Amino acid sequence: MEVKTLANIKSAIKRAELNVKANEKNSAQKSAMRTAIKAFEANPSEELFRAASSSIDKAESKGLIHKNKASRDKARLAAKLG
């Protein structure tokens, strides 16, 4: 993998490559979370609520979102469920 970086030291180049990979994984996980939330909001159902809640929990456990944001998001979704 070729990463555009100013780093000259081998370990710094490797860290830059790993940072790009981590950013792609994290972005994909957050995007999946947002997609699950939007799917639930478009058609509130118990099944979609569980999927959205699960994706929020996964993002929280990976450190992508703060635990308070996860709780707030799940509470708002639960309120929409009724």
UniProtKB/Swiss-Prot annotation:
Any one Gene Ontology molecular-function term assigned to this protein's record: structural constituent of ribosome
Record has Hydrolase as a keyword: no
Gene Ontology annotations of biological process type: translation
UniProt-listed InterPro entries: Ribosomal_bS20, Ribosomal_bS20_sf
Keyword DNA damage: no
Record-level GO cellular component terms: cytosol; small ribosomal subunit
Keyword terms, alphabetized: Ribonucleoprotein, Ribosomal protein, RNA-binding, rRNA-binding
Domain of life: Bacteria
Entries under NCBIfam families matching the protein: S20
Annotated HAMAP family: Ribosomal_bS20
Job of this protein: Binds directly to 16S ribosomal RNA.
Family (UniProt): Belongs to the bacterial ribosomal protein bS20 family.
Protein name: Small ribosomal subunit protein bS20
Lineage: Bacteria, Bacillati, Bacillota, Bacilli, Lactobacillales
